[in-house]
Regions:
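Non-catalytic, solvent-exposed segments at the cell envelope interface
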Residues: 1-211
Length: 211
């Protein structure tokens, strides 16, 4: 606990809800611990694999960690992370893919280099993400360097058919890190716009005054 003074850790959950019902009864497909150095502003992200077999409640029930969110929402998911990983996380933030797409669009998109394998699959994920979020986008034309809008960045973070869950979590962290970098460099008007667009769509223990 002494070593964590000056740091703020937030559990970030990305859920597969298609109907904005993000409080529970939906799996947390993304589980990321976001550690913020309050003095320097440095942000470090650590993924928890959604299929990790852990104790999800105080009854000693072992199953995939993403089930904790399904059963008891963010509070039970945070309790499970604290219990299994010996942490003392108090804050959480839950989003669905529409909130992420909207935020990235406000920030002006992100630059990402696509491998040939990623490009092979991404357009089908773009189509699915447009249908599930109602946010417009278009297919990409090539592998290599690409400027991705919100839906395309979400599709990139969701890719999983061509490699491992580890690689998928790397893509998730990359999208979040690039978004955080743009947010830190943005002017007040853009930051305010992001907050106005995103906060009504997410579930969080954090207030705007905490940000």
């Amino acid at each position: 606990e002494e070593n964590m003074k000056g740091y703020w850790t937030i559990a970030i959950f990305g859920v597969d809800a298609r109907d904005n019902a993000i409080e529970k009864s939906t799996n947390s497909d993304v589980i990321i611990l976001c550690n913020i150095n309050r003095d320097t502003g440095e942000i470090k992200l650590v993924s928890v694999y959604r299929d990790s077999y852990l104790n999800i409640n105080d009854k000693g029930s072992y199953t995939k960690i993403n089930q904790a969110y399904f059963v008891g929402g963010p509070k039970q998911a945070v309790e499970a992370l604290n219990r299994n990983l010996d942490l003392q996380i108090q804050d959480y933030m839950t989003f669905n893919w529409k909130a992420v797409a909207n935020a990235i669009d406000v920030l002006g998109g992100v630059d990402i280099e696509l491998s040939k394998a990623e490009f092979y699959y991404i357009n089908s994920y773009i189509t699915e993400t447009v249908e599930s979020t109602g946010v417009g986008s278009h297919h990409l034309k090539k592998a290599g360097p690409n400027h991705l809008d919100g839906v395309q960045a979400v599709a990139y973070a969701r890719l999983r058919k061509m490699d491992t869950d580890y690689a998928r979590t790397e893509r998730q962290r990359k999208v979040i890190e690039l978004s955080f970098d743009k947010l830190k460099k943005a002017d007040f008007a853009v930051v305010n716009n992001v907050m106005e667009v995103v906060f009504p769509q997410i579930l969080t223990s954090i207030t705007l005054n905490d940000m």
